[in-house]
């Protein structure tokens, strides 16, 4: 079991069904020590308003021993790698995931998708690329993994890509994990929960990790401290309330 989950959605994204409080309760029951709420960026039709992200400072950092990170799953908008998390939002958010979503950036050919994904990493604000194995968005896996290692951006293994979403992702996810391993980069695991019961569900990710013999030393979810250290290296301030997790 990994004690950190880095990708989930609340009722603020209206196609999801749980609240922040629901996730805290579930985390306590499952032994999850730290999680990031990553509702969709505002360019998605059912995403929270900009004010949602600007007001996340009202969230407690720690509830009943469970740490809470303020996140976003931003949208990669174009081949230049622009995302819908900019300006003052950047200072309000602890962890920025970014990925392709069809309502914002329609699937392109492999060259264009690769260009956009690498450009998003190069801009310097993105910490994790979400579900890069989506077969609707073919990429040059080796080039993306090399760029991710160079920019210290984690590529995600998304558990829901094996179950409810993005059918046909498994072979790509396996190839991505192997490419990240060979490039010396980071993997991040995300349940991509849209309901609290899925929190911390990484069983399919764990199978891929075992199959490619991915080193645990390069998985961000191994401990809260590893994830927090990663964010601090990437320029985020230390979060005093989470120092003892």
Swiss-Prot record:
Homotrimer. Zn(2+) 2 binds at residues 15, 40, 194. The keyword Cell division does not apply. This is Probable phosphatase Spro_1934. One of its GO terms (molecular function) is zinc ion binding. It is an enzyme of class 3 (hydrolase). Belongs to the PHP family. Zn(2+) 3 binds at residues 73, 101, 131. Zn(2+) 1 binds at residues 7, 9, 73, 192. It comes from the Bacteria. Its cofactor is Zn(2+).
């Amino acid at each position: 079991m990994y004690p950190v989950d880095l990708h989930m959605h609340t009722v603020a994204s209206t196609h999801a069904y749980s609240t922040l409080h629901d996730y805290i309760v579930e985390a306590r029951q499952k032994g999850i020590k730290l999680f990031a709420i990553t509702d969709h960026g505002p360019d998605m039709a059912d995403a929270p308003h900009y004010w949602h992200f600007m007001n996340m400072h009202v969230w407690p950092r720690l509830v009943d021993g469970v740490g809470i990170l303020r996140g976003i799953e931003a949208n990669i908008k174009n081949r230049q790698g622009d995302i819908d998390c900019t300006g003052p939002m950047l200072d309000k958010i602890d962890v920025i995931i970014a990925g392709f979503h069809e309502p914002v950036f329609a699937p392109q050919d492999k060259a264009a998708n690769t260009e956009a994904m690498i450009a998003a990493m190069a801009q310097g604000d993105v910490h994790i690329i979400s579900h890069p194995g989506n077969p609707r968005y073919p990429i040059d896996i080796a080039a993306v993994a090399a760029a991710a290692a160079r920019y210290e951006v984690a590529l995600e293994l998304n558990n829901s890509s094996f179950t409810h979403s993005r059918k046909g992702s498994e072979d790509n996810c396996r190839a991505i994990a192997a490419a990240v391993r060979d490039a010396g980069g980071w993997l991040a695991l995300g349940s991509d929960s849209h309901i609290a019961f899925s929190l911390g569900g990484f069983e399919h990710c764990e199978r891929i990790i075992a199959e490619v013999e991915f080193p645990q030393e390069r998985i961000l979810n191994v401990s809260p401290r590893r994830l927090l250290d990663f964010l601090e290296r990437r320029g985020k301030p230390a979060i005093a309330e989470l120092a003892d997790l």
